[in-house]
Amino acid sequence: MPSQKSFRTKQKLAKAQKQNRPLPQWIRLRTDNKIRYNAKRRHWRRTKLGI
């Protein structure tokens, strides 16, 4: 990844960074909640974004 990124690439990286976080705990406490964890969690070394 070059240090001088295009704006589009930077936007994609920023979105991926925001998505890559654990589930908020208050969501797990809701009634009839089926979600236990964030299934779309991504590790920087294991899974690459492909951009």
From Swiss-Prot:
Gene3D superfamilies per UniProt: Ribosomal protein L39e
InterPro entries: Ribosomal_eL39, Ribosomal_eL39_CS, Ribosomal_eL39_dom_sf
GO terms, biological process: translation
Record bears the keyword Ribosomal protein: yes
Main subcellular localisation: cytoplasm
Similarity-based family: Belongs to the eukaryotic ribosomal protein eL39 family.
Physiological role: Component of the ribosome, a large ribonucleoprotein complex responsible for the synthesis of proteins in the cell. The small ribosomal subunit (SSU) binds messenger RNAs (mRNAs) and translates the encoded message by selecting cognate aminoacyl-transfer RNA (tRNA) molecules. The large subunit (LSU) contains the ribosomal catalytic site termed the peptidyl transferase center (PTC), which catalyzes the formation of peptide bonds, thereby polymerizing the amino acids delivered by tRNAs into a polypeptide chain.
The protein's assembly and partners: Component of the large ribosomal subunit. Mature ribosomes consist of a small (40S) and a large (60S) subunit. The 40S subunit contains about 32 different proteins and 1 molecule of RNA (18S). The 60S subunit contains 45 different proteins and 3 molecules of RNA (25S, 5.8S and 5S).
Protein's name according to its UniProt entry: Large ribosomal subunit protein eL39
This protein's encoding gene: RPL39
